[in-house]
């Protein structure tokens, strides 16, 4: 099988040297992502496209899906590459390929040609289109807005029969821009802002301020791992967790109620800036949107920025919440975000929307900054690829099984869309559907006399959720890995 990767248009207008660098980086990213599917896969770069050739037909859908999620790709063409002799040979091959698709449809033929030939692209379009129209009685030519467009590419003595076109996510290849550190909470905003910077070519590391204990961190790890695995797995990134409970405690004890929100954000920026400097990261990324909450007014954002020289990027600054939620739905983080607790919102009952710098600084004089220094010094920094391995160690008391007992039930915790696309059926055992984002509220309603075997395709989510349920006191859970 063969795929032709078309570049994001902004790449094609770069200077020659920059364009070549971008294409080289994108080629490497594609190799890094796809090597998990087929080690014999070949990735070949050209001036205006990249070819991907693979032998394992069983991995075709997985490879195609992975390509649509790699930043820098505008669209993917799935093609059949065959030799040809003349225009009539092109027609005959097109007839075999497209006959079934054109039955009862209106169509047109579009041809791109490279190389030396005794015919033009329009000649091929007319010849093939006329032939298809004659040989498929129920088909009809329509040059504007046809139901089916037959795409052909002729290159020297090769014919590319385009079997399908699939849109990519566009943007720049990861690694073409510098690294950033995303302040991730697991909510709608931070997940979307992280994705937007990945799509713009940045390697995104994650910094999490833990305000809610182990369960909160597990949830945010899931979001970060999902984003990395889905859009950024071509590169290694860090997941940095900072235990911010001592900082919150100090703020609650010593800071005036109205100033708490702004001061908490200032402390977060201070801590994140130190982490960024430690790891050579150039900028911070937040999910703040203008006026969304009290700390996100222009006055307050300026005061928050003042505590650090590190550049702070806010890709969602002009977005409304509905737009952000729609983006979260598109990239797959909506379900995570809906069940993620929001701890920052409860810290202040009457927050100021227009903080005064002198008052903020006066309040911060009461704060013991050694506490902030200590939590930054004790950050937990892990390679995001190790999250699954760490989860295995953390849930060592949760048994992993590949067989069944008489009291066992498989609990499919994938999202509803995934379950509908690939229903799980296992002979001889009941399978119950309960998406992961409903486990925290609905698992207790299940029959607690049964043993529930949590299952997801990769096993990461099932292990994380097993740990969470164990922490909640449910001992009748295991992880199912066939």
From Swiss-Prot:
Keywords from the named record: ATP-binding, Cytoplasm, Disulfide bond, Nucleotide-binding, Redox-active center, RNA-binding, Thiamine biosynthesis, Transferase, tRNA-binding
Subcellular locations according to the entry: Cytoplasm
TM annotation in the entry: none
Intrachain S-S bonds: 344-456
UniProt pathway: Cofactor biosynthesis; thiamine diphosphate biosynthesis
Record domain Rhodanese: where: 404-482
GO BP, one annotated term: tRNA 4-thiouridine biosynthesis
Residues at the catalytic site: 456 (cysteine persulfide intermediate)
GO MF annotations in UniProt: ATP binding; CCA tRNA nucleotidyltransferase activity; tRNA binding; tRNA-uracil-4 sulfurtransferase activity
Residues binding ATP: 183-184, 265, 287, 296
Domain (THUMP) ranges: 61-165
Keyword RNA-binding: yes
Main subcellular location of this protein, as a coarse class: cytoplasm
GO CC terms in record: cytosol
Reaction catalyzed: [ThiI sulfur-carrier protein]-S-sulfanyl-L-cysteine + a uridine in tRNA + 2 reduced [2Fe-2S]-[ferredoxin] + ATP + H(+) = [ThiI sulfur-carrier protein]-L-cysteine + a 4-thiouridine in tRNA + 2 oxidized [2Fe-2S]-[ferredoxin] + AMP + diphosphate; [ThiS sulfur-carrier protein]-C-terminal Gly-Gly-AMP + S-sulfanyl-L-cysteinyl-[cysteine desulfurase] + AH2 = [ThiS sulfur-carrier protein]-C-terminal-Gly-aminoethanethioate + L-cysteinyl-[cysteine desulfurase] + A + AMP + 2 H(+)
CDD domains: PPase_ThiI, RHOD, THUMP_ThiI
EC number: 2.8.1.4
PROSITE patterns reported for this sequence: RHODANESE_3, THUMP
InterPro entries: Rhodanese-like_dom, Rhodanese-like_dom_sf, Rossmann-like_a/b/a_fold, ThiI_AANH, ThiI_fer, ThiI_N, THII_Thiazole_biosynth_dom, THUMP_dom
Family label: Belongs to the ThiI family.
Matching NCBIfam families: ThiI_C_thiazole, tRNA uracil 4-sulfurtransferase ThiI
Cited function: Catalyzes the ATP-dependent transfer of a sulfur to tRNA to produce 4-thiouridine in position 8 of tRNAs, which functions as a near-UV photosensor. Also catalyzes the transfer of sulfur to the sulfur carrier protein ThiS, forming ThiS-thiocarboxylate. This is a step in the synthesis of thiazole, in the thiamine biosynthesis pathway. The sulfur is donated as persulfide by IscS.
Annotated protein name in UniProt: tRNA sulfurtransferase
Gene this protein is translated from: thiI
């Amino acid at each position: 099988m063969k795929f032709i990767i078309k570049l994001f248009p902004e790449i094609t207008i770069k200077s020659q040297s920059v364009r070549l660098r971008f294409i080289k980086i994108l080629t490497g990213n594609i190799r890094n992502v796809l090597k998990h599917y087929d080690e014999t896969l070949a990735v070949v770069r050209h001036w205006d496209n990249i070819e991907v050739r693979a032998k394992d037909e069983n991995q075709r859908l997985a490879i195609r899906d992975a390509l649509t999620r790699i930043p820098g790709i505008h669209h993917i063409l799935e093609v059949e590459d065959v030799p040809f002799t003349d225009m009539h040979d092109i027609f005959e091959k097109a007839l075999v390929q497209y006959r079934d698709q054109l039955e009862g449809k209106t169509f047109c033929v579009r041809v791109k040609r490279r190389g030396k030939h005794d015919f033009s692209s329009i000649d091929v379009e007319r010849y093939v289109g006329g032939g298809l129209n004659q040989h498929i009685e129920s088909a009809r030519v329509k040059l504007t807005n046809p139901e089916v467009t037959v795409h052909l590419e002729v290159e020297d003595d090769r014919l590319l029969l385009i079997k399908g076109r699939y849109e990519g996510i566009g943007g720049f290849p990861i690694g073409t821009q510098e690294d950033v550190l995303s302040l991730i909470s697991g909510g709608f905003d931070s997940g979307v802002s992280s994705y937007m910077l990945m799509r713009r070519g940045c390697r995104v590391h994650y910094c999490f301020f833990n305000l809610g204990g182990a369960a909160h961190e597990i949830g945010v790890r899931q979001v970060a791992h999902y984003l990395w695995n889905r859009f950024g797995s071509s590169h290694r990134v860090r997941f940095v967790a900072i235990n911010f409970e001592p900082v919150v405690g100090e703020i609650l004890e010593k800071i005036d109620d109205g100033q708490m929100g702004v001061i908490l954000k200032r402390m977060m920026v201070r801590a994140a800036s130190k982490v960024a400097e430690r790891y050579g990261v150039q900028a911070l990324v937040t999910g703040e949107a203008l006026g969304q909450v009290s700390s996100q007014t222009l006055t307050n954002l300026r005061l928050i920025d003042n505590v650090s020289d590190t550049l702070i990027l806010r890709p969602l600054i002009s977005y409304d919440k509905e737009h952000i939620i729609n983006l979260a739905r598109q990239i797959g983080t909506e379900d995570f975000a809906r069940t993620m607790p929001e701890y920052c919102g409860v810290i202040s009952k009457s927050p100021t929307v227009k903080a005064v710098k002198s008052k903020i600084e006066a309040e911060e004089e009461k704060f013991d900054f050694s506490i902030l220094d200590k939590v930054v010094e004790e950050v937990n920094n892990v390679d995001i690829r190790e999250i699954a391995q760490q989860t295995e160690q953390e849930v060592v008391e949760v048994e992993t099984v590949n067989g069944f007992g008489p009291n066992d039930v498989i609990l499919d915790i994938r999202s509803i869309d995934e379950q509908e696309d690939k229903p799980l059926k296992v002979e001889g055992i009941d399978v119950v559907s309960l998406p992961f984002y409903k486990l925290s509220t609905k698992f207790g309603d299940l029959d607690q006399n049964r043993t529930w075997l949590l299952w997801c395709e990769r096993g990461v989510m099932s292990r994380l959720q097993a740990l969470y349920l164990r922490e909640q006191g449910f001992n009748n859970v295991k992880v199912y890995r066939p």
